[in-house]
UniProtKB/Swiss-Prot annotation:
Binding site residues for Mg(2+): D105
EC number: 3.1.-.-
The gene coding this protein: xni
Binding locations of K(+): L172, A173, P181, V183, I186
5'-3' exonuclease domain residues: 161-251
Stored NCBIfam families: PRK09482.1
Alphabetized UniProt keyword annotations: DNA-binding, Endonuclease, Hydrolase, Magnesium, Metal-binding, Nuclease, Potassium
Descriptive protein name: Flap endonuclease Xni
Origin: domain of life: Bacteria
GO biological process: DNA replication, Okazaki fragment processing
Disulfide bonds: none
Annotated HAMAP family: Xni
């Protein structure tokens, strides 16, 4: 079985860079990132590995909703200037890059999904909870900084909903970290209660006459935001990827 280690590049590198005493020390960063990747390769023993990077193009999510990820700190200049050098260094050490046009998330989701379609296994190295919507048993999520798997069961317990309801939950409650609006006035607690009764976002709106009047009013007024939030949260898993597995094989 092909076992593909897919590293969310900026999710890993920005955390490592932020912990450095000197943010301009790109040589030190290269060594630290490579050390982290060696540790990942040694632990997971994949047949293939790649690090996926965000691109500079405006994402379709940002084009759809201007406030998406608004307020996030920009990438430090020293890190931005050192990325090309970092990627080349990692390639020299048997870890090739995939450069997304905009957000890496959809490329990672597509690659992981394609792996499962050929009976492969994908291990996504990222702390981004959005990947928990990829619930195929052959897709796993690894938190490098806490050295443990981010399991579907843990996320279900944390949010209070089933894995099949993750997107519906965020469409209702929103996601402050990514500035996903959700339905104004419907917080996490209300979202959980509604999904326990009606099971899905579609069922909630199809049964709006069975919802209490106050909540029904909020839901009706926030219907467009719910639809928008659902789109923003949902990962694309069918992007065209011009890559060949052979490019990313790890020589044992």
């Amino acid at each position: 079985m092909n076992k593909f280690l897919i590293i969310d590049g900026m999710n890993l590198v920005r955390r490592i860079h932020a912990a450095q005493p000197n943010e301009s020390d790109i040589t030190g960063l290269k060594e630290r990132v490579n050390g982290a990747c060696r540790k990942l390769l040694k632990f997971h023993q994949p047949s293939h590995a790649a690090i996926v990077w965000d691109g500079d193009a405006i994402s379709w999510r940002k084009a759809l909703f201007e406030d998406y990820k608004k307020g996030r700190k920009p990438m430090p200049e020293a890190l931005a200037n050192g990325l090309v050098e970092l990627k080349a260094y990692l390639a020299e050490h048997q870890l090739n890059s995939i450069n997304a046009d905009s957000e890496a998330d959809d490329v990672i989701a597509t690659l992981a999904t394609k792996l499962t379609s050929i009976n492969g296994e994908a291990i996504i190295v990222s702390t981004d909870k959005g990947f928990c919507q990829l619930s195929h048993p052959n897709i796993k999520r690894w938190d490098h900084f806490n050295q443990g798997y981010l399991t579907i069961e843990e996320m279900e317990k944390k949010l209070g909903v089933e894995s099949t309801q993750f997107i519906d939950y965020l469409a209702l409650a929103g996601d402050s970290g990514n500035k996903i609006p959700g339905v104004p006035g419907i917080g996490p607690k209300s979202a959980v209660e509604l999904l326990k009764i009606f099971r899905s976002l579609a069922n909630i709106y199809n049964s709006i006459d069975k919802v209490g009047s106050k909540q029904a009013k909020k839901l009706e007024e926030g219907k467009q935001m719910a639809r928008l939030s659902y789109k923003l949260v949902q990962l694309q898993t069918d992007l065209p990827l011009n890559v060949n597995l052979k490019q990313f094989r790890i020589e044992q």
